[in-house]
């Protein structure tokens, strides 16, 4: 099978690894920043010229993809960039297609639409306390803190506003807006909560939740000036009683959106409060950027799960206790201890690059001279962790107040 993958930064990396391991499959992919890591694993990255063609306007992208499919006998088109969901409309009947439909992509690119779906199915959402246009004279003024600023109908990250200085900075950066008449809304910030993530697969009108987690500290990096989320964050499993409630609420949402079509992986972020309530916050209709998770299944099982029987995903994740360890260094020029992944059979991170035969965190994972990445796998041995801690200068993030 020949695969063309069009993704955001490395968010299908671990799925592509499964395809590239087999002589049955040939993988082509776009890329961001560098190509050395992917190429080392037999993932054929597009030329710089062809990679740039995917940044052109819609009609030219469709034309390029159509030519590429024909010239390279592509059997499977995998698209995780929600701004290119129009490719689903054009190619869904021509090749096997993994990715959201145009309607589904709006769940990520149109935050009001995603909130409306939640409200429709009885899932709580934070209150909207202000709306307007970025060009309005009162943008980000007269707020009570903390609060969250979100674009209403265009794709851009939410901004946590913790104090007046954050709001002033947001106003200062308004000149960067391409479309000042775009709408925004200010959402209440739920203080008494833990941030939860739910990961899922939708295929052929059905869905399965693969895993859940609690993430601590990421919200502090989602400020006016977005920071690298690896720094200062910590991930751990949800407590069983919390997991039960989160999955129950997630089911309501997933039952609705699975009717909208598409075959894709996704996740959403929610807030669980001390009173046992869960609030829907945001949706991604693709795997996480620079944070893909091992699939725990072969490439052929992955394809069968997407197109024939979604229970392949259920079986793959059964009894999997996923661990996600954030690891950082204060010097981004220090070599990453890649050899220990081979030694202890631990899944490799996805945001590395290779320079002179050595592994380093890619530019996407660096900030202020430091860097970080994430190690995701099940049954990560204590010996692996111990050897990194005792023989390298890399450090694992610790649970705050843990």
Stretches with model-predicted labels:
Residues 124-126, 160-193, 228-232, 251-258:
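Conserved ATP-binding module of the ATP-grasp superfamily
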Residues 200-255, 284-316:
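ATP-dependent carboxylate/phosphate-activation module, predominantly the ATP-grasp catalytic core
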Residues 251-292, 322-335:
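Conserved metal-phosphate-binding beta-hairpin within the catalytic cores
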């Amino acid at each position: 099978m020949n695969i063309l993958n069009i993704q955001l930064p490395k968010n299908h990396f671990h799925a592509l690894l499964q395809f590239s391991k087999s002589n049955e499959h040939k993988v082509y992919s776009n890329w961001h920043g560098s190509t050395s890591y992917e190429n080392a694993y037999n993932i054929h990255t597009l030329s710089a010229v062809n990679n740039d063609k995917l940044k052109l306007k819609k009609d030219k992208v469709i034309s390029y993809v159509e030519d590429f499919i024909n010239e390279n006998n592509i059997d499977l088109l995998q698209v995780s960039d929600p701004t290119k969901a129009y490719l689903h409309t054009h190619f869904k009947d021509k090749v096997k297609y993994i990715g959201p439909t145009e309607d589904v992509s709006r769940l990520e690119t149109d935050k009001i639409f995603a909130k409306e779906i939640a409200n429709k199915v009885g899932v709580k959402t934070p209150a909207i306390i202000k709306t307007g246009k970025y060009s309005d004279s009162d943008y980000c003024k007269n707020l009570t803190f903390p609060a969250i600023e979100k674009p209403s109908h265009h794709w851009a990250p939410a901004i946590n506003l913790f104090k007046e200085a954050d709001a002033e900075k947001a106003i200062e950066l308004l000149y960067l807006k391409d479309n000042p008449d775009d709408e925004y809304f200010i959402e209440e910030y739920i203080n008494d909560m833990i941030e939860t993530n739910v990961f899922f697969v939708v295929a052929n009108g059905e869905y399965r939740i693969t895993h859940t987690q609690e993430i601590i500290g990421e919200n502090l990096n989602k400020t006016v000036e977005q920071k690298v989320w690896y720094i200062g964050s910590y991930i751990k499993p949800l407590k069983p009683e919390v997991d039960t409630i989160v999955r129950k609420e997630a089911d309501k949402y997933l039952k609705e959106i699975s009717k909208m079509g598409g075959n894709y992986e996704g996740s959403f972020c929610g807030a669980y409060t001390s009173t046992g309530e869960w609030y829907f916050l945001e949706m991604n209709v693709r795997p996480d950027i620079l944070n893909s998770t091992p699939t725990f299944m072969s490439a052929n099982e992955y394809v069968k799960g997407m197109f024939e029987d979604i229970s392949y995903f259920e079986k793959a994740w059964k009894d999997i206790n996923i661990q996600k360890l954030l690891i950082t260094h204060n010097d981004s020029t220090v070599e990453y201890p890649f050899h220990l992944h081979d030694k202890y059979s631990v899944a490799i991170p996805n945001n590395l690059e290779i320079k002179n035969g050595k592994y380093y965190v890619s530019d996407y994972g660096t900030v202020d001279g430091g860097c970080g990445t994430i190690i995701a796998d099940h049954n990560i041995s204590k010996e692996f962790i111990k050897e990194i801690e005792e023989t390298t200068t890399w450090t694992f993030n610790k649970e705050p107040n843990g």
